């Protein structure tokens, strides 16, 4: 299963915020965009979805930004991926119309595989993903791509 860029970014935002020493300190969208090497507009779109889901809170104002709205140990990764992926089907049987529709065994097999994928990911919480942060040096990595931030 290939995750959408939207989901990938959402997981990275959550991991970054979970690795912060002070969970109460809000992080601005430009800061997250620079650190994670993602377009600021996509960071905003992804963050809005995660605020709506209740995983992040947005603090307005000059010193505002985003911070976790839940405990990392309460946030299961499979639930995050399922919500951000926002699709029920791995294949679209309607476009173009499939001649096997209504009698296809593959669609059921794919649905079971998708559920097994989410179930496996739910064995991990955001707290578990903090292991890939401080101590392993991941939190100290910056974008290695040549990116211009003059538009931020």
Enumerate the predicted regions with their spans:
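Short alpha-helical segments that sit at the start of domains
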Residues: 1-13
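Basic amphipathic alpha-helical segments that dock to polyanions
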Residues: 47-51
């Amino acid at each position: 299963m290939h995750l959408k860029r939207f989901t990938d970014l959402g997981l990275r935002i959550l991991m970054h915020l979970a690795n912060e020493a002070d969970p109460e300190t809000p992080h601005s969208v430009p800061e997250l965009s620079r650190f994670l090497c993602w377009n600021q507009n996509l960071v905003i779109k992804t963050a809005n979805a995660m605020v709506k889901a209740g995983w992040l809170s947005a603090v307005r104002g000059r010193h505002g930004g985003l911070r976790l709205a839940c405990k990392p140990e309460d946030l299961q990764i499979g639930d995050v991926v399922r919500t951000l992926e926002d699709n029920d089907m791995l294949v679209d049987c309607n476009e173009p119309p499939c001649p096997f529709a209504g009698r296809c065994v593959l669609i059921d097999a794919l649905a079971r595989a998708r559920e097994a994928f989410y179930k496996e990911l739910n064995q991990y919480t955001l707290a578990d993903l903090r292991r890939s942060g401080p101590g392993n040096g991941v939190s100290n990595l910056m974008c290695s791509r040549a990116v211009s931030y003059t538009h931020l």
